[in-house]
Curated annotation (Swiss-Prot):
Protein name in the entry: Major S-layer protein
Ranges of Acidic residues composition bias in the record: 590-627
GO cellular component entries: extracellular region; plasma membrane; S-layer
Biological process terms in GO annotation: cell wall organization
Length: 669
């Protein structure tokens, strides 16, 4: 019996070691249109044409898109080739194609040589072809900016990916600046740039032997002004463009990209297809190539899927809807920002624009946001033990739970809905996110019960003893009163899978957690305003918000709709209109900085005024991807490690426990 206990403890310890050693990063999923049909051929017939279903950047927010120039480069197609049937795509039936296009510099000054450049999207990333008309040699675009940056002599401007420029000196007349370009602190090139009348003020760095190509422009810098002051010498830069030439790549015909392995290069066009069949496995994510996936629903009655891109790098990302040119309507199938449950095929939100009549002004009541409560399955779906469904409401692209299942007026954000397994020792806390945690206080001597405690910001909320003996449902529901004047509100559900009382440790295994942020629950009133949406109507399970005043889609601007949702409008002629809705999602964390020596690095801030003697240190510099701006608090999809504690065993403690088990076994022998 002792040997059995020791072996059982060892198994659970091993599970815990691996659970605590692996840390799940936050992930943003950018999805394409949702396709739903009886099988793949039905979907191609319904959504495609000429035996082909094609997705481009106007529909798939992950693909590169320039709204001002209306430029796309990438398409992903599914073809009705032989072998395409059921949920299987035949050989050559997946076609990824991208073609070089010309786009304007952000710093658009054609008279000064800043007009346009060649760009190609490559698996939802922006690349620059080394040869403007050949798609075989590519370097990632690091920076394309028209912001103004002011740097003192001796200071560096961090451009990202380890690249930087430094203002070495300014001449005594304040007409020239000596700039130096470095990579990972190593000298690359330098130049003296003049800003006197008649100069183009632009420095182009050309390098040789970039994938066997010479005279490759890797950096462009436009110096706006130079100032020689009594205290400081400074240069103002407006216009930066940079490629990651050190990691340039050459694409060969025998290269493979995930499940796409048949590569064809025809001048400015790159085409990659699948040589083998591709199965859309239900309830799974199948990688197409380079971080692009097909996500397929867990539904045996139909085939439902979408293409998507997974992002894990820290930063703030724009998630857009389908591009419109007039009156239009978006829901979760064509706006990736809206809540969508692919398994249950459930969406709740819609956004509609009517009454434009060829102009860019939406009349009163012409902008309508509507959302309706729907039922979805728990991630831990076990109807036999009470884990079947719960009500959900998308609210401005966030997932909320109605306090009353059939009323859309009182909402709390969903923090967690998980079917992952977590193993915690007595005395340890499991961080659930947003300041919520549960702790295993004690396990009974028979290993059949566990005492759990629920806290918020370290303060006691509730506790319970959960039994796992046969016949118990093993689920703890925390019900609280006075949540927006409602009583008996379920705020937490926890399913305890196993309890173990060992010779070394007492542990509990949890599988199934559901939590709402009840502490920040809100009530929506009819006189509330959400940005420019200020006419609120609540009709049972449906919430409708419209505009009481006219709403102008200002060209070359981002216009807030409400609650962090915007329209981005293209810089077009007055006779044209092009726009899309978007939200921003943020992955927290520090962006990796290749330059570890920060003592002499200043990241300048934008400066829209004439250069004067600076009184403060500039504080910010350009990055490839925006890291500031409106951030969206996202529900935590998985519990994370609390500060100072680890859910489950740490690796070291786990190993110590294993050694103890070995000792017990040897002693009993």
């Amino acid at each position: 019996m002792k040997r059995f206990a020791a072996v059982s403890l060892a198994a659970l310890m091993l599970l815990t070691v691996f659970a605590s050693a692996a840390s799940a990063a936050d992930v943003i999923e950018i999805r394409g249109p949702v396709y739903n049909g009886s099988d793949i051929n039905d979907i191609i017939d319904t959504y495609g044409e000429n035996n082909a279903l094609t997705i481009d950047a106007t529909k798939f927010a992950a693909f590169y898109y320039d709204i001002d120039d209306n430029v796309t480069t990438e398409t992903l197609s599914i073809l009705a080739v032989p072998g395409t049937e059921g949920n299987v795509i035949g050989e050559g039936g997946i076609v990824y194609e991208t073609t070089i296009q010309q786009v304007d510099y952000e710093f658009y000054r054609p008279a000064a040589g800043w007009s346009n450049y060649s760009l190609i999207g490559f698996f939802a990333e922006k690349y620059i072809p080394i040869n403007p008309d050949k798609a075989d040699k590519l370097a990632k675009l690091v920076l394309d900016s028209d912001d103004k940056y002011t740097i003192r002599t001796g200071e560096q401007l961090d451009l990202g990916e380890g690249y930087s420029i430094e203002a070495k000196q300014v001449d005594v007349d304040g007409e020239k600046v000596w700039l130096e370009f470095t990579k990972d602190g190593e000298f690359v090139d330098d130049e003296i740039i003049s800003v006197v009348s008649g100069s183009d003020n632009t420095w182009e760095v050309e390098l040789d032997d970039i994938q066997d190509e010479d005279d490759v422009v890797v950096l462009r810098v436009h110096v706006n002004q130079v100032f020689q002051g009594a205290v400081d010498s400074i240069a103002q830069i407006e216009g930066l463009w940079l490629i990651d030439y050190t990691n340039a790549m050459k694409i060969e015909s025998d290269d493979e990209f995930g499940n796409l392995d048949n590569v064809k290069i025809n001048g400015d066009t790159l085409t990659i297809t699948n040589e083998d069949t591709f199965t859309l496995t239900r309830d799974d994510e199948e990688e197409i190539a380079e971080g692009l996936f097909f996500k397929t629903a867990d539904d045996t009655r139909a085939l439902r899927f979408y293409a998507m891109k997974q992002i894990t790098e820290p930063g703030t990302y724009e998630i857009r809807g389908e591009v419109a040119e007039g009156d239009f309507s978006w829901d979760a199938t064509n706006f990736a920002g809206f809540f969508y449950d692919v398994n249950d095929d459930v969406s709740t939100e819609s956004l509609t624009v009517t009454g434009l009549n060829g102009g860019n002004v939406i009349p009163e009541g012409g902008l309508v946001y509507e959302t309706t409560i729907q039922m979805v399955d728990y991630e831990y779906s076990k109807p036999s033990v009470g884990w079947d469904q719960f009500p959900v409401l998308g609210f401005f692209a966030e997932e909320y739970i109605p306090i009353n299942a059939d009323k859309a007026d009182k909402l709390a954000k969903l923090v967690l809905d998980s079917d992952d397994k977590y193993t915690i020792r007595t005395g340890e806390q499991l961080d659930l996110g947003e300041g919520y945690a549960i702790e295993a206080k004690q396990v009974d001597v028979d290993g059949e019960k566990v005492w759990l405690e629920f806290t918020k910001d370290g303060e006691f909320v509730d506790d319970e003893i959960i039994s796992v003996v046969s016949g118990s449902d093993n689920t703890w529901e925390v019900e609280l009163d006075d949540i927006q004047d409602e009583d008996d509100v379920v705020v937490l559900r926890v399913h305890v899978n196993q309890v173990f009382q060992g010779a070394v440790d007492s542990i509990a295994q949890i599988e199934g957690i559901w939590l709402i942020d009840y502490a920040n629950a809100m009530k929506i009133e009819s006189d509330d305003e959400f940005g420019d949406l200020d006419n609120v109507k609540i009709n049972g399970a449906t919430l409708t918000i419209t505009n009481e005043d006219t709403f102008t889609l200002t060209r070359d601007d981002e216009v807030e709709i409400g609650q962090g949702m915007f329209f981005k409008v293209a810089d077009t002629a007055a006779s044209d209109l092009r726009y899309y809705p978007f939200v921003e999602k943020t992955i927290d964390g520090e962006v990796v900085d290749d330059d570890e020596d920060d003592d002499n690095v200043t990241e300048p801030v934008d400066n829209d005024t004439e250069v004067e003697e600076p009184t403060e240190e500039p504080t910010e510099g350009p990055t490839e991807e925006p890291t500031e701006g409106p951030t969206t608090e996202e529900p935590t999809e998985e519990p994370t490690e609390a500060d100072g504690t680890t859910p489950g065993f740490g690796v070291v403690l786990g190993l110590v426990g294993l050694l103890a088990v070995v000792y017990l076994v040897r002693r009993n022998n």
